[in-house]
């Protein structure tokens, strides 16, 4: 019998073992679709970004007008630009759902996979931040100024570090040029880390909603989950295209239609919606260094979740108290997102401080406590 080429060819067998003959748990739900959706988002962003980079000019005097040129004069430039901008939002929607699913079903106990995933999140956040600066509108400029300035809170080397990042004494042409270079580079770094992420995942195999070992009941990835993923792509691309065609600027900031002006500060400086929860945590602490540490902790706290798992059960499927706490955390994050978009005044300051405190309380104290309590109740 002749060898099957997909199983014998050195390159094809890697694809075969990852996407065709991969043994997968038979009961994984739609929550397991977001990994492949993130892959589609990344490919879409790289392709649209490449096309945009062909027409974009990374110079302070030309950047804003080059975006206008793309939207007006380039064939389907408006579509490519809006797909790229809104694709970023969908990227973050998918990654937040993906992390939430990992948190709910205890996937973080695959420590290497989880840790590479957090590194991916941090790289994605960096990519989105430097990308937001490129149109060189008011919010781009002031967002870059405010966020890069946070590094000056680092004792002793802070100010030097900021000026080194800027390439001068303020956000100017060198800053824009290097941000464009970074924005081009980082997505390929994300693609590389994604391969490491998948390598670690395929060492252990996927988790499943019950959080139990599923070696005895595996099914091939193709055709079952390949088809399910295609359905997922369709269900994501429909809202993305709807947003892009009918309301492309819905998630953007009106300030960014004004070219960057270092002499005029916008009334409310705020990042894109997907960073608002972290921005609210940053603002809730009246001390600069404290705020920066809280901002860093809000994401880096994810590294601690495997260490804070005290339950004898992996998944939350049969842990009602932990479920309630999980949805409280989700509601808390939504409140933080809303507060981050509001001006710094009463009552938003107090709400932000309470929500920030609750965020860390739930993750660091209540989850381990409830996990231990459920052990006492069940076992």
Swiss-Prot record:
Q: Which GO terms describe its cellular component?
A: mitochondrial inner membrane; respiratory chain complex III
Protein purpose: Component of the ubiquinol-cytochrome c reductase complex (complex III or cytochrome b-c1 complex) that is part of the mitochondrial respiratory chain. The b-c1 complex mediates electron transfer from ubiquinol to cytochrome c. Contributes to the generation of a proton gradient across the mitochondrial membrane that is then used for ATP synthesis.
> Where does the sequence pass through the membrane?
34-54, 78-99, 114-134, 179-199, 227-247, 289-309, 321-341, 348-368
Q: How does it sit in the membrane?
A: Multi-pass membrane protein
Name of the protein: Cytochrome b
The keyword Transport is assigned to this record: yes
- Please name the source species: Apteryx australis
Name the principal localization, coarsely classed.
Answer: mitochondrion
The organism's taxonomic lineage, starting at the top: Eukaryota, Metazoa, Chordata, Craniata, Vertebrata
Which positions are annotated as binding heme b b566? 98, 197
InterPro entries assigned: Cyt_b/b6_C, Cyt_b/b6_C_sf, Cyt_b/b6_N, Cytb/b6-like_sf, Cytochrome_b, Cytochrome_b_C_euk/bac, Cytochrome_b_N_euk/bac, Di-haem_cyt_TM
The record's subcellular locations are: Mitochondrion inner membrane
């Amino acid at each position: 019998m002749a060898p099957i080429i997909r199983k014998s060819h050195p390159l094809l067998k890697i694809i075969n073992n990852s996407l065709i003959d991969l043994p997968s748990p038979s009961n994984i739900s739609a929550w397991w679709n977001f990994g492949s959706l993130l892959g589609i988002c990344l490919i879409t962003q790289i392709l649209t970004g490449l096309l945009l980079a062909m027409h974009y000019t990374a110079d302070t005097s030309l950047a804003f007008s080059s975006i206008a040129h793309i939207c007006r004069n380039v064939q389907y430039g408006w579509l490519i630009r809006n797909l790229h901008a809104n694709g970023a939002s969908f990227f973050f929607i998918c990654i937040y759902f993906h992390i939430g699913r990992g948190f709910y079903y205890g996937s973080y106990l695959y420590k290497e996979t989880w840790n590479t995933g957090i590194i991916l999140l941090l790289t994605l956040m960096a990519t989105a931040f430097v990308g937001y600066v490129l149109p060189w509108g008011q919010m781009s400029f002031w967002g870059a100024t405010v966020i890069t300035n946070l590094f000056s809170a680092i004792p002793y080397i802070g100010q030097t570090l900021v000026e080194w990042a800027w390439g001068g004494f303020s956000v100017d042409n060198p800053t824009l040029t290097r941000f464009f270079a970074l924005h081009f580079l980082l997505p390929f770094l994300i693609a590389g880390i994604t391969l490491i992420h998948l390598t670690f995942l395929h060492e252990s195999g996927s988790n499943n909603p019950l959080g139990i070992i599923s070696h005895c009941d595996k099914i091939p990835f193709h055709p079952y989950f390949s088809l399910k993923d295609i359905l997922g792509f369709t269900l994501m691309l429909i809202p993305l295209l709807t947003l892009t065609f009918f309301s492309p600027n819905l998630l953007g900031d009106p300030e960014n239609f004004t070219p960057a002006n270092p002499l005029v500060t916008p009334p409310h400086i705020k990042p894109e919606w997907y960073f608002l929860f972290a921005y609210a945590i940053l603002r809730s602490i009246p001390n600069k260094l404290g705020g920066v540490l809280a901002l860093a902790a809000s994401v880096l706290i994810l590294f601690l979740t495997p260490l804070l798992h005290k339950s004898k059960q992996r998944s939350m499927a049969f842990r009602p108290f932990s479920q309630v706490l999980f949805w409280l955390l989700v509601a808390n994050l939504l409140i933080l997102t809303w507060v981050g978009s509001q001006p710094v005044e009463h009552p938003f300051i107090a709400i932000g401080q309470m929500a920030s405190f609750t965020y860390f309380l739930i993750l660091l104290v209540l989850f381990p406590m409830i996990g231990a309590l459920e052990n006492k109740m069940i076992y």
